[in-house]
Amino acid sequence: MGPCGALGLGLLLAAVCGAAAPELHTLRYIQTAMTDPGPGQPWFVTVGYVDGELFVHYNSTARRYVPRTEWIAAKADQQYWDGQTQIGQGNEQIDRENLGILQRRYNQTGGSHTVQWMYGCDILEGGPIRGYYQMAYDGRDFTAFDKGTMTFTAAVPEAVPTKRKWEEESEPERWKNYLEETCVEWLRRYVEYGKAELGRRERPEVRVWGKEADGILTLSCRAHGFYPRPIVVSWLKDGAVRGQDAHSGGIVPNGDGTYHTWVTIDAQPGDGDKYQCRVEHASLPQPGLYSWEPPQPNLVPIVAGVAVAIVAIAIMVGVGFIIYRRHAGKKGKGYNIAPGSNPAI
């Protein structure tokens, strides 16, 4: 099946998209259980993403897996949906128990609490396969599966009993098999199902600009209108990535099915020419580099002033010439020969 079977304890909500690459594909399931979801809201929700696109959804109100894309609705049969629904209902029941266990372990008697899981895999054609299985409680890391060492990592003391229990119950073997076999098999199948949509490529339109205030030059790089969702936008200074100094706005969907994102970085006013924005996306044959160009001095007022001066001079010359002609004409009338007079001899 697509999602794993009923799970034990266990993840912090992580990015749905993987690193940008021409043939990278990702499958992610994010599962959330809440003690206090709010009026009219389901307390348990699972969503699935292929290449960053939401394709399935389950919640504790409907209690069924439902499609969120046309391609999965068209390709998956009823047996698939019945099987996924059975898994969703099993995970829902286990997370109801998990919320109670964690509240007792943390000595909590009430309040709003949340368990989050993220699990899935990435495949890069001709490259490595990566798998993830993590858990968080109340927004903090709780435990994660290390596929390399076949162990679970306890991020907090309260997670140690869970780590021991899972390792004694052979959970590492089960999750290794899921992440390397089952997950990859279903990801390839989903990519085949949705190849017409998932294979679409829209190049990002990139704009770089800067704004100086209080002695700091803030450089911004915005990529707009790209598809698929995975993208890497980073700032370079003298050719070196400045990841820790940059701030990202996240990847946000547009109304037309594409996405946009932006990344900013602060620099010294005189260092703007040392920075470049690098954009990596499946639609680009190679990473694009974009530089900030400082605005040129505004020549419009100068040109306008010169033009006004030229016009003024022209008007003055014209007026002066007219006055001169009129004055010269008046002098000429006093010396004209009278009509019919003979010339002097």
Swiss-Prot record:
<comment type="function">
    <text>Involved in the presentation of foreign antigens to the immune system.</text>
</comment>
<feature type="region of interest" description="Alpha-2">
    <location>
        <begin position="111"/>
        <end position="201"/>
    </location>
</feature>
<feature type="disulfide bond">
    <location>
        <begin position="221"/>
        <end position="277"/>
    </location>
</feature>
<dbReference type="GO" id="GO:0042612">
    <property type="term" value="C:MHC class I protein complex"/>
</dbReference>
<feature type="topological domain" description="Cytoplasmic">
    <location>
        <begin position="325"/>
        <end position="345"/>
    </location>
</feature>
<keyword id="KW-0472">Membrane</keyword>
<feature type="glycosylation site" description="N-linked (GlcNAc...) asparagine">
    <location>
        <position position="107"/>
    </location>
</feature>
<dbReference type="InterPro" id="IPR001039">
    <property type="entry name" value="MHC_I_a_a1/a2"/>
</dbReference>
<feature type="glycosylation site" description="N-linked (GlcNAc...) asparagine">
    <location>
        <position position="59"/>
    </location>
</feature>
<keyword id="KW-0325">Glycoprotein</keyword>
<feature type="region of interest" description="Alpha-1">
    <location>
        <begin position="23"/>
        <end position="110"/>
    </location>
</feature>
<dbReference type="InterPro" id="IPR011161">
    <property type="entry name" value="MHC_I-like_Ag-recog"/>
</dbReference>
<dbReference type="InterPro" id="IPR036179">
    <property type="entry name" value="Ig-like_dom_sf"/>
</dbReference>
<dbReference type="Pfam" id="PF00129">
    <property type="entry name" value="MHC_I"/>
</dbReference>
<keyword id="KW-0812">Transmembrane</keyword>
<feature type="region of interest" description="Alpha-3">
    <location>
        <begin position="202"/>
        <end position="292"/>
    </location>
</feature>
<comment type="similarity">
    <text>Belongs to the MHC class I family.</text>
</comment>
<dbReference type="InterPro" id="IPR011162">
    <property type="entry name" value="MHC_I/II-like_Ag-recog"/>
</dbReference>
<feature type="domain" description="Ig-like C1-type">
    <location>
        <begin position="204"/>
        <end position="293"/>
    </location>
</feature>
<keyword id="KW-1133">Transmembrane helix</keyword>
<dbReference type="GO" id="GO:0005615">
    <property type="term" value="C:extracellular space"/>
</dbReference>
<dbReference type="InterPro" id="IPR003006">
    <property type="entry name" value="Ig/MHC_CS"/>
</dbReference>
<keyword id="KW-0391">Immunity</keyword>
<comment type="subunit">
    <text>Heterodimer of an alpha chain and a beta chain (beta-2-microglobulin).</text>
</comment>
<protein>
    <recommendedName>
        <fullName>Class I histocompatibility antigen, F10 alpha chain</fullName>
    </recommendedName>
</protein>
<feature type="region of interest" description="Connecting peptide">
    <location>
        <begin position="293"/>
        <end position="301"/>
    </location>
</feature>
<dbReference type="InterPro" id="IPR013783">
    <property type="entry name" value="Ig-like_fold"/>
</dbReference>
<keyword id="KW-0732">Signal</keyword>
<dbReference type="InterPro" id="IPR037055">
    <property type="entry name" value="MHC_I-like_Ag-recog_sf"/>
</dbReference>
<keyword id="KW-1015">Disulfide bond</keyword>
<dbReference type="GO" id="GO:0009897">
    <property type="term" value="C:external side of plasma membrane"/>
</dbReference>
<feature type="signal peptide">
    <location>
        <begin position="1"/>
        <end position="22"/>
    </location>
</feature>
<dbReference type="Pfam" id="PF07654">
    <property type="entry name" value="C1-set"/>
</dbReference>
<feature type="transmembrane region" description="Helical">
    <location>
        <begin position="302"/>
        <end position="324"/>
    </location>
</feature>
<dbReference type="InterPro" id="IPR003597">
    <property type="entry name" value="Ig_C1-set"/>
</dbReference>
<dbReference type="InterPro" id="IPR050208">
    <property type="entry name" value="MHC_class-I_related"/>
</dbReference>
<feature type="topological domain" description="Extracellular">
    <location>
        <begin position="23"/>
        <end position="301"/>
    </location>
</feature>
<feature type="disulfide bond">
    <location>
        <begin position="121"/>
        <end position="183"/>
    </location>
</feature>
<dbReference type="GO" id="GO:0002474">
    <property type="term" value="P:antigen processing and presentation of peptide antigen via MHC class I"/>
</dbReference>
<dbReference type="GO" id="GO:0006955">
    <property type="term" value="P:immune response"/>
</dbReference>
<keyword id="KW-0490">MHC I</keyword>
<dbReference type="InterPro" id="IPR007110">
    <property type="entry name" value="Ig-like_dom"/>
</dbReference>
